[in-house]
């Protein structure tokens, strides 16, 4: 139920606000498409977490690029700061 409300909010944004604001997302897929995919794939909690970390990375100083929704659910106790600074595609494996 909560997931459906969040999906409705994102779809409302895409319908009402996005055409007025223009396309300024630096990532592929766009942040709103990413949000819809994350919510539908991982549910309300994990999808919201992924959406918020993605929005925090989408700024003028970010290189952007391809950043698909991960197939696995995120670990909430993992290194949040690192996830905000570096997209998952740019992380180096240890």
UniProtKB/Swiss-Prot annotation:
Range of residues in the leader sequence: none
GO cellular-component term (any): plasma membrane
One Pfam family per UniProt: YidD
Membrane topology reported for the UniProt record: Peripheral membrane protein
Domain of life: Bacteria
Alphabetized UniProt keyword annotations: Cell inner membrane, Cell membrane, Membrane
Localisation: Cell inner membrane
Function: Could be involved in insertion of integral membrane proteins into the membrane.
Family indicated by similarity: Belongs to the UPF0161 family.
Record-given protein name: Putative membrane protein insertion efficiency factor
Species for this entry: Albidiferax ferrireducens (strain ATCC BAA-621 / DSM 15236 / T118) (Rhodoferax ferrireducens)
């Amino acid at each position: 139920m909560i997931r459906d409300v969040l999906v409705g909010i994102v779809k409302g944004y895409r319908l009402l606000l996005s055409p007025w604001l223009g396309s300024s997302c630096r990532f592929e897929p766009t942040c709103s498409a990413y949000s819809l995919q994350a919510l539908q794939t991982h549910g309300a909690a994990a999808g919201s977490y992924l959406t918020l970390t993605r929005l925090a990375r989408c700024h003028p100083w970010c290189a952007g690029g391809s950043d698909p929704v991960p197939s696995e659910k995120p670990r909430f106790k993992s290194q949040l700061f690192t996830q905000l600074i570096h997209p998952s595609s740019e992380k180096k494996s240890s």
